[in-house]
Amino acid sequence: SVSCAAASPVFNESTLRVASLTFAMLAYGLPVGDPARDKMCEVYQATSAALANPDLILDAGTIYFADPKAPDRLKTLIESTVGRLQVVDKLNIADDGVLAVIESGMMAGFALRPQSVASESQLEKVSNQLVTLTALNSDLYGSPERHPAIQLIELLRLFRSSGFRELVDRIRNTSVPAGGYEANPILSASDVLKLVMKKHKLSEDAAAYYLQLLTLPDPTDKNVGLWNGWTAAA
């Protein structure tokens, strides 16, 4: 069962969001060897440990529903989606061990145990449950993915993805020398660079610029100059 006292006052959805998005931004935007970039591996380990804590419960937002013609609709939907509502610490709670829903008349709050959704199949199951429940407020959020509960699931999916783990491994073990940028394919993807040079008959610098324009989100003149060590005179 779950009670309000079980919620963590330190690690919450905002903590996970900052850890996930900041990690990706610093890994991309800072040079290899930068202390802040290297520190992110410790942040990853600490975040992983927090998510693996069976006592951690994350707030996943609320829904509101009031219809005089269907006063039991919210309760019925909760019980058909999560399980039977029971009184715990004077609260009406449905709890399947992963997702808990606290019902209070016209409102229901969601709480999620991240330790229990470690696999993609578990994430998919709880995601489907939350999509069903948050559909009651589709007029407020416009689309299901804008509800905090669904955004929390997507953050968990991002943080636990193979791509995110590969990013962590790359920070720990990179071929790029200290001071260089992963965004420079001359340093980070020499094999791919050589293939592009051969196929398109380009110089090393031209091939690097071609790849940056093709794959990176912000290959501005300023950024490319920083990544590649180019100056206006060059």
Task: Label each region the model flagged.
Residues 1-186:
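Long, compositionally biased low-complexity segments enriched in polar/charged residues
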Residues 181-183, 196, 212:
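Catalytic cores of nucleic-acid ligases and guanylyltransferases
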Residues 186-199:
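Short, Lys/Arg-enriched N-terminal segment that forms or immediately precedes the first helix
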Residues 194, 222-223:
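Residues within the helices of the helix-turn-helix
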Residues 199-219:
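Short amphipathic alpha-helical interface segments
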Residues 227-234:
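Short amphipathic alpha-helical interaction segments
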